[in-house]
């Protein structure tokens, strides 16, 4: 942060010298505000940087706005002629009654990356505070990494990937539910088989018990008949 702040101070000193040429140093206070950073894609074609200011103790006259660009070279004054034509590289729009000015960079290219500084000056005021600059807006113009065709293709691929992932999730859920239901069905079948086997076993046991009961009930009757036959005299014997 040290070297950057030092370089910016040097830039502001150099720009202040340019502002001093606009009017004699001498009575009001101006404060200038700018966004510190702005990053755009060069395919945007245009970019606008805003600058707002406030005044204290200054006369009721319109101040003069100036723009400077600081790149790899010395500070460069922009739009000294006003830059009112939108066909130009730079276009300045002033709304001084609202304390607002803006600079639009047309036909963007990566070479437009620089620090753009807004300056507001009351030329007829003798004090240095009547001529002030903002801290500057660092504009970064990025080259587009992909063409429109590649960008569209990536969107389509992402959509297909989303559909594929959704389908896989649905299949996984269905398989998981079917597997969780299979053991239950198997248990139900095994339980029914066990119940039917128990029922058959009980029926066989009841049948055997019934037969045994019938046999045991007939056995005393047969024994009684046999004894009665022995007790009876045989015919033909005196």
Swiss-Prot record:
| Residue ranges of the region described as Disordered | 215-238
Does the entry feature the keyword Ion transport, yes or no?
Answer: no
Q: Which residues lie on this side of the membrane: Extracellular?
A: 28-153
Q: Which SMART domains match?
A: IG, IGv
Q: Which UniProt keywords apply?
A: Disulfide bond, Immunoglobulin domain, Membrane, Signal, Transmembrane, Transmembrane helix
* Extent of Basic and acidic residues compositional bias: 215-230
The record ties this protein, via Pfam families, to:
V-set
What additional remark is attached to this entry?
This gene is coded entirely within the intron of Mettl9 which is transcribed in the opposite strand of the DNA.
Membrane topology per the record? Single-pass type I membrane protein
According to the entry, every stretch annotated as the Ig-like C2-type domain falls at 30-134
Which cysteine pairs make disulfide bonds?
51-118
Q: Name one GO cellular component term.
A: membrane
> What residue ranges are annotated as transmembrane?
154-174
Q: Which PROSITE patterns match?
A: IG_LIKE
Q: Where in the cell is it found?
A: Membrane
Q: Which organism is it from?
A: Rattus norvegicus (Rat)
What is the protein name given in its UniProt record? Answer: Immunoglobulin superfamily member 6
Q: Which residues form the signal peptide?
A: 1-27
Q: Which residues are on the Cytoplasmic side of the membrane? A: 175-238
| Highest taxon in the source lineage | Eukaryota
């Amino acid at each position: 942060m040290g070297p950057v702040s030092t370089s910016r101070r040097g830039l502001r000193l150099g720009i202040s010298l340019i502002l001093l040429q606009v009017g004699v140093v001498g009575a009001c206070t101006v404060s200038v505000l700018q966004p510190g950073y702005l990053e755009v894609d060069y395919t945007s074609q245009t970019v606008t940087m805003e600058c707002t200011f406030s005044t204290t103790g200054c006369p009721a006259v319109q101040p003069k706005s100036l723009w400077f660009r600081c790149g790899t070279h010395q500070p460069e004054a922009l739009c000294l002629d006003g830059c009112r034509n939108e066909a130009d590289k730079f276009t300045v729009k002033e709304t001084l009654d609202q304390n607002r000015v803006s600079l639009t960079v047309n036909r963007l290219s990566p070479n437009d990356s620089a620090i753009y500084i807004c300056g507001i000056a009351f030329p007829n005021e003798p004090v240095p505070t009547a001529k002030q600059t903002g801290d500057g807006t660092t504009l970064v113009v990025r080259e587009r990494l992909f063409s429109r065709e590649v960008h569209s293709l990536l969107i389509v691929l992402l959509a297909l990937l989303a559909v594929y992932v959704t389908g896989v999730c649905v299949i996984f859920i269905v398989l998981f539910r079917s597997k969780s239901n299979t053991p239950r069905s198997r248990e139900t079948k095994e339980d029914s088989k066990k119940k039917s086997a128990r029922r058959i076993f009980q029926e066989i046991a009841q049948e055997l018990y019934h037969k045994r009961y019938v046999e045991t009930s007939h056995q005393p009757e047969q024994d009684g008949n046999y004894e009665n036959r022995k007790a009876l005299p045989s015919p033909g014997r005196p």
